[in-house]
Every structure is written in structure tokens, then in C-alpha cells.
């Protein structure tokens, strides 16, 4: 299938400001089953320079520079991708002892995965909850991940367009949250049992509730399978309806646009996301 999306973000300032460098994560990541067909980035006012990099976690990062004051900033990214369906469970966990929890990653991977194993929860509440789910899944790794996904899916979904993810304990206790809250809880539960997990930001097609805003989901690293996506908001594995913009150990680094400006001005943001 082909996915075609346009994402426009417009900042307005009540007085002229000098824009500092702006960091964009609006360029889709490549995956074996998904490839970019067309991409267009439009920025007003016209930047003095755009530098496209690969950041420390392998994401495409675009740094944008300006040399004139402005009262607005409009960034529009339009992209079209070929996204092929595939079997997300077509793998064999190896070494075989990784098929059950708890397990140890092969020694060469441990250092590389440390950022994705760092504990998120400040208390033991999430670990105890994760242990209960794992016991119900006979401590099978894949069965645990699916059960965790479905358990969070049963929470009460809330639209929350701004703000950092809630602490995982808050989402667990309240039984409600946004997609980024669900994802942060999923990650915390995985890491509490020694499964490397990271936060992914991007777009989701085919869900009217989600496709007009940024979406968040998780990826876990499974020996023999690599990084595999799980979407606790959908209660599903990630196949071909998701477009990946950035994946990171720290959710606060996943913003599509970040930067500073100099000037005594307030700003407002208007955002529009459309699948075409």
C-alpha cells in the first residue's frame, strides 16, 4: 500500500523574533518493508541553510538556520511511502533461552542496549504489574509482549495534544492516558523485566482518531528479531500502517520540531496532519 501524508506546523509570534537553529525530525526512517517514494520540505521564511544529518540514534535529523527576524515560522513536510505488508512474527528468538523471561542479552549487545534498558519507573509498582502479566503469559517473551499490549489497550484513551508523557505509575494507577502515556508505560514495563525498549514517534494511517495527529508507539529489541514495533494504543503489532519519524531511548527527544528564539514575544502553534 502507499501512504501519503502532509504535516504542517505554523508558529506565530506577536513580535518579531530571531529564530535560533531549529531541529526537525520530520523525515521518515527507512525499514526493510517500507521505502520513501517522494519527500518535500517547505519552510517559510526561507532558511539560510538546511543541514541533514543522522543523529546518534540513527534518525534523520534536519537542522534549519535563519538569518532574518520573523513573526512566523511555517514548516510543511509532505511524503509518500510504499509500505508493504509483512508477518511481524516471522522470526526465531535466538539464543533460544531468550524465548522465556527473564533472559540475558548476548554479551556483545549489552553495552549497546544500555540506554534502552534504563529503568523508567521510580517505584516497584510497574515491575510488579509486569511480573503479573508475565506470569499469566507463562513467562513466554512474545506472549508477554502481546498481553502487555492488550492490557494497556483496555485503558481509557484521552486526547492530550501537548505536554510530556505522564510518569508510568500515573498512567497505570489512573488507567487512562494518551498514546505517548501508553507507550511510556509499555516501555517501563518491558525494561523492568530486562527487555530493551524505545519510544517511537510518527504517523498512523487508518484510524480516524489517530491519523490527524502525531502518534507514539514502542519498539523492543528481541535477539533474532531485531527491533519490533508494538502499539499499545491500537493493541497491535506494527506492520504497514505506521510511518516512523524518530525512535529514541528518551521520549523528550522525539519532538518533530524543537528550537529557540530570541525576543520578548509569545508564540502560538497551529498544526494540521492529513493523509492524502
Language model: regions and residue ranges:
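Intrinsically disordered, low-complexity N-terminal segments that are enriched in acidic
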Residues: 1-90, 94-101
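Flexible, active-site-adjacent loop/turn segments at secondary-structure boundaries
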Residues: 15, 41, 64, 111-115, ...
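Residues in well-ordered beta-strands of folded domains
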Residues: 25-27, 42-44, 78, 219, ...
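Short low-complexity stretches enriched in small and charged residues
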Residues: 28-37, 85, 152-153, 173-178, ...
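Secondary-structure boundary elements
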Residues: 101-177, 185, 251, 261-275
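Hydrophobic/aromatic-rich core segments of domains that either
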Residues: 136, 181-265
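Short N-terminal helix-initiation segments at or just after the protein's N-terminus
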Residues: 14-25, 157-167, 215-216
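Short capping/connector residues at structural and topological boundaries
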Residues: 22, 71, 106, 162, ...
Amino acid at each position: 500500500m502507499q501512504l501519503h501524508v502532509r504535516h504542517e506546523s505554523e508558529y506565530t509570534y506577536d513580535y518579531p523574533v530571531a529564530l535560533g537553529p531549529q531541529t526537525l525530525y520530520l523525515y521518515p526512517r527507512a525499514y526493510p518493508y517500507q521505502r520513501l517514494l517522494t519527500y518535500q520540505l517547505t519552510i517559510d521564511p526561507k532558511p539560510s541553510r538546511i543541514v541533514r544529518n543522522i543523529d546518534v540514534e540513527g534518525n534523520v535529523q534536519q537542522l534549519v538556520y535563519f538569518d532574518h527576524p520573523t513573526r512566523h515560522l511555517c514548516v510543511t513536510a509532505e511524503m509518500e511511502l510504499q509500505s508493504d505488508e509483512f508477518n511481524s512474527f516471522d522470526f526465531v528468538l535466538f539464543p533460544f533461552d531468550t524465548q522465556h523471561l527473564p533472559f540475558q542479552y548476548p554479551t556483545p549487545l549489552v553495552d549497546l542496549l544500555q540506554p534502552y534498558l534504563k529503568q523508567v519507573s521510580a517505584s516497584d509498582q510497574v515491575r510488579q504489574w509486569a511480573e503479573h502479566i508475565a506470569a499469566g503469559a507463562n513467562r513466554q517473551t512474545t506472549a508477554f509482549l502481546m498481553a502487555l499490549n492488550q492490557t494497556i489497550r483496555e485503558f481509557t484513551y484521552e486526547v492530550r495534544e501537548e505536554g510530556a508523557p505522564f510518569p508510568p505509575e500515573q498512567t497505570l494507577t489512573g488507567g487512562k492516558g494518551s498514546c505517548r502515556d501508553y507507550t511510556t508505560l509499555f516501555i517501563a514495563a518491558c525494561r523492568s523485566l530486562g527487555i530493551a525498549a524505545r519510544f517511537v514517534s510518527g504517523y498512523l494511517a487508518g484510524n480516524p482518531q489517530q491519523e490527524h495527529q502525531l502518534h507514539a508507539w514502542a519498539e523492543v529489541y528481541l535477539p533474532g528479531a531485531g527491533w519490533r514495533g508494538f502499539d499499545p494504543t491500537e493493541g497491535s503489532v506494527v506492520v504497514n500502517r505506521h510511518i516512523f519519524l524518530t525512535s529514541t531511548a528518551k521520549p523528550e527527544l522525539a519532538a518533530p520540531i524543537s528550537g529557540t528564539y530570541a525576543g520578548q514575544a509569545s508564540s502560538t502553534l497551529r498544526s494540521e496532519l492529513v493523509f492524502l
